């Protein structure tokens, strides 16, 4: 299974999506199909795609390479750097 798919499924079946899905259904949800459908329909898949594209993009690749002191092209290293150091902070407009 490719890296991107493993990460996306981990988010779809993870505690955050599971919690939001349970809130939407009013009960705990353990069914993988229900979790996947909720993840897609609620925008989780689109959000993941945008974050993954940014993590693999040239700007993050440059910052990650600078951080490691060498050219980085490995998707897992880029993803980990983006999620830990490069993802923009969420701002809540009031």
Residue ranges and their predicted role:
Residues 1-94:
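Polar low-complexity intrinsically disordered regions
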């Amino acid at each position: 299974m490719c890296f991107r798919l493993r990460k996306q499924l981990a988010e779809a079946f993870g505690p955050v999506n599971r919690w939001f899905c349970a809130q939407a259904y009013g009960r705990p949800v353990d069914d993988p199909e229900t979790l996947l459908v909720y993840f897609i329909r609620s925008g989780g898949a689109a959000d993941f795609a945008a974050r993954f594209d940014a993590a693999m993009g040239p700007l993050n690749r440059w910052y990650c390479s600078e951080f490691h002191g060498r050219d980085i092209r490995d998707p897992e290293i880029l993803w980990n750097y983006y999620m830990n150091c490069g993802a923009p902070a969420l701002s809540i407009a009031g």
